[in-house]
A protein has these predicted regions:
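Compositionally biased, intrinsically disordered low-complexity segments enriched in polar/Pro/Gly
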Residues: 1-165
Length: 165
């Protein structure tokens, strides 16, 4: 992230410390594409494994993140978004495709003067601001007061998926 600041001759640029779209005491922010990858992993399972209990187990993992390392992704980096499948009559088994979103865990984030922030891939980070007087620029501007990292997805053990990578 970087900023270029431009002011009129004789003016002094305000340091918003990473806040974007500042209007008065409000920070509007901006929409960006978050690092995220969607992928499917196809496996073949014997017909005896695909039971109602197995399907219910899959359903219980939808919308959960990985509680431990899985498919070489660290805990918190995978979100299980579902599965689809069909029976293959000739092979007498099931073809299942597990669907995931991946987003990297991030550490050493700095927002304003707040350092040492870290978040898991699917955590939601938001910032609370307070008014700060900038004597040089002669304005009152928002200053990051607190960074909040919210765990919006529960985690689950993905080992019952029995994916061999």
């Amino acid at each position: 992230r970087s900023s270029d600041l431009f002011v009129a001759d004789g003016g002094t640029a305000a340091n918003y410390k990473g806040a974007i779209g500042v209007e008065g005491d409000e920070v509007k922010g901006c929409d960006i594409v978050a690092p995220r990858l969607s992928f499917g992993w196809t496996v073949y399972k014997p017909k005896e494994i695909i039971t109602v209990a197995y399907v219910k187990s899959l359903a219980s993992m939808v919308g959960r993140t990985n509680a431990s390392a899985f498919l070489s992704f660290a805990a918190g980096e995978l979100l299980f978004v579902g599965a689809s499948g069909s029976r293959r009559a000739k092979q007498d088994d099931w073809e299942l495709t597990f669907k995931f979103d991946a987003s990297p865990n991030v550490s050493d984030i700095t927002i304003g003067d707040i350092t040492g922030i870290s978040k898991l891939g699917f955590d939601y980070l938001w910032v609370a601001y307070e008014a700060d007087e900038d004597d040089d620029a002669k304005i009152v501007k928002p200053q990051p007061r607190q960074v909040n990292v919210e765990r919006v997805y529960r985690s689950a053990d993905f080992s019952p998926l029995s994916i061999n990578a």
